[in-house]
Amino acid sequence: MAAADNITGDMTLADYTFPHARLRRRITSPDRTPLVLIACGSFSPITFLHLRMFAMAADYARFNTEFEVVGAYLSCVGDAYKKTGLVKAEHRVNMCSLAVAQSSWLSVDPWEALHEEYLETAKVLDHFHQEINVEMGGVETPAGRKQCKIALLAGADLIQTMSTPGVWDPKDIDYILKNFGAFIVERTGTDIDEALSTLQPYTPNIFVIQQLVQNDISSTKIRLFRRRDMSIRYLVPEPVVNYIEEHSLYDEDGAASTSSDGKGGGKGKGPGESKGATSEFPG
């Protein structure tokens, strides 16, 4: 049975403690740098592609870099982020927790989702650095304690939006890509080379992962299937399917939407940043 942190969507910030049960606290190679992958997004709902992206990134890191993955986290955007199809954070955290329940290394951190206000991606990554590298002191290695590299994990549309003028504040891009970096999974229809051409100063800290098996599942398509009363089984984890059906999520009536009219309220930008860049991750 996988270690668990008992994360539930009805937690409050007063109840919050950082989930670390599945974070590996020691690596055996003195030459490797511990890596923690962070996926920030809507996850409305989480799909098998979201989970698969973590596995692809871990393989890429093992075969192509000096990093060694010691943990990975899903961080759901909070309810202050208004978007079509976004159900309450409580539901999204619960679905993510169900999706990773049997994993030995994937975790859900509800910290971002528990905030009433919108949090920029940079603040979320700072939170992980504080908890893992400052409060916990990194991880043990044969060469002594090392800080973990905290890196963003996302689809290629993230880099595309970062290279599009007016979507992100240049200061946010600089802060994220200089201090953390990103593991980016290629997606059909995204010209990754064109997107990277405007981010040349940061390319040493951007790791592009090729999808060897093309997977086009998206949260948007899952919601569409639900509205059309079509099956979503084998596109999302079975416990998530059951949860969606039990709570009548993504039905035609738009149950549990964070938007009062069911149409969203725009992209809910934080100062200088559009969370729309990563919110569907992908979908």
Where are these regions (language model features)?
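Nucleotidyltransferase catalytic core that binds NTPs
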Residues: M1-G283
